[in-house]
A protein has these predicted regions:
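Glycine-rich phosphate/pyrophosphate-handling loop used in enzymes and phosphotransfer proteins
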Residues: 1-158
Length: 158
């Protein structure tokens, strides 16, 4: 039975190869969405280490009252983070959102953030966009984040 499953998996990989979302290299069995090389080059911020004192918090402070600001990736035009967001939003790749949420959750776990929140709440998507896209990219990210942190995700916003 195991040999049959391996054959089916190998056959599916031949017809529908799993490639890195950034460099398009073939992924190994232990990789998901990004190859190890591209994952290592992600522009990850250190905002989770200093959520009360970072430049993004300073920028938002003038707009609204903010206690803490966390961000996973630094956004640069035409950079890796923008390419991943475009895959997620415009190329029908919800797994990218889940992957990014899961990775960010793993990073936050190292700083013991799992005890900081009661639940993860995704930002709702306009119903017309949801109908067109078929999924809410924020919800996909929230699913991965909630799973990594071991807390509930709840769709409580409209």
């Amino acid at each position: 039975m195991r040999m049959r499953l391996l054959f089916v998996k190998d056959f599916l990989d031949l017809i529908f190869p799993r490639n890195c979302e950034l460099c398009t290299r073939a992924l190994f069995d232990y990789e998901f969405c990004l190859c190890t090389i591209c994952e290592g080059k992600l522009p990850i911020t250190s905002y989770h280490l200093r959520a009360t004192d970072n430049d993004l918090k300073d920028k938002l402070q003038g707009l609204t009252r903010v206690l803490r600001v966390l961000a996973f990736l630094k956004f640069t035009k035409n950079g890796k983070s923008q390419r991943l967001l475009h895959q997620l939003k415009y190329r029908n790749k919800p797994q990218v959102g889940y992957y990014l949420g899961k990775k960010y959750g793993q990073l936050l776990l190292k700083q013991d953030y799992s005890k900081s929140w009661d639940c993860i709440v995704p930002v709702p998507l306009h119903r017309m966009k949801l109908k067109r896209r078929g999924y809410n990219q924020s919800e996909e990210f929230a699913k991965g984040l909630a799973e990594s942190l071991g807390i509930q995700m709840e769709n409580i916003l409209e």
